[in-house]
Amino acid sequence: MAYDVFTKVVSQADSRGEFLSNEQLDALANVVKEGNKRLDVVNRITSNASTIVTNAARALFEEQPQLIAPGGNAYTNRRMAACLRDMEIILRYITYAILAGDASILDDRCLNGLRETYQALGTPGSSVAVGIQKMKEAAINIANDPNGITKGDCSALISEVASYFDRAAAAVA
């Protein structure tokens, strides 16, 4: 994302044979500042990924105990491990989308066809969607912690982060 912006601005100035204007430099400085916020959020989510996934799964299974009961979709260690793995993969691709500022990597490499795969396997997409929403709550709480991150208003970024989780939940529901 940032690299493309820098390349575009420099190429435009170069094609006109001009130095970068103060406005262009300010805009690029803002891109860096916003990029630092993205890095902070991704770093926090990544550093806490295991906890986010585990706690989301635990909360999901408390709400929907039939999933881990005999005959449930997460019953047996193998199925439980597959559930946790899938939640972790979805979270990982959400962090890629946050970093890029673009949902296409999430859609193209993770979500496209996921609902159909779950349907074919008999996995309840609505339960996966609940798990994703629980990961969203945890990730946003972690991302909103003001300690040790780039200062500034992050409300737009947090809304964007929430939208990636919502997109993932809608894709599997």
Curated annotation (Swiss-Prot):
It comes from the Bacteria. (2R,3E)-phycocyanobilin 1 binds at C83. (2R,3E)-phycocyanobilin 2 binds at C154. It is a peripheral membrane protein. InterPro entries: Globin-like_sf, Phycobilisome_asu/bsu, Phycobilisome_asu/bsu_sf, Phycocyanin_b. Pfam families: Phycobilisome. SUPFAM superfamilies: Globin-like (SSF46458). The modification N4-methylasparagine is found at N73. It is found in: Cellular thylakoid membrane. Keywords: Antenna complex, Bile pigment, Chromophore, Electron transport, Membrane, Methylation, Photosynthesis, Phycobilisome, Thylakoid, Transport. GO terms for cellular component: phycobilisome; plasma membrane-derived thylakoid membrane. Contains two covalently linked bilin chromophores. GO terms for biological process: photosynthesis. Belongs to the phycobiliprotein family. Heterodimer of an alpha and a beta subunit. Heterodimers further assemble into trimers and the trimers into hexamers. Light-harvesting photosynthetic bile pigment-protein from the phycobiliprotein complex (phycobilisome, PBS). Phycocyanin is the major phycobiliprotein in the PBS rod. This is C-phycocyanin beta subunit. It comes from Mastigocladus laminosus.
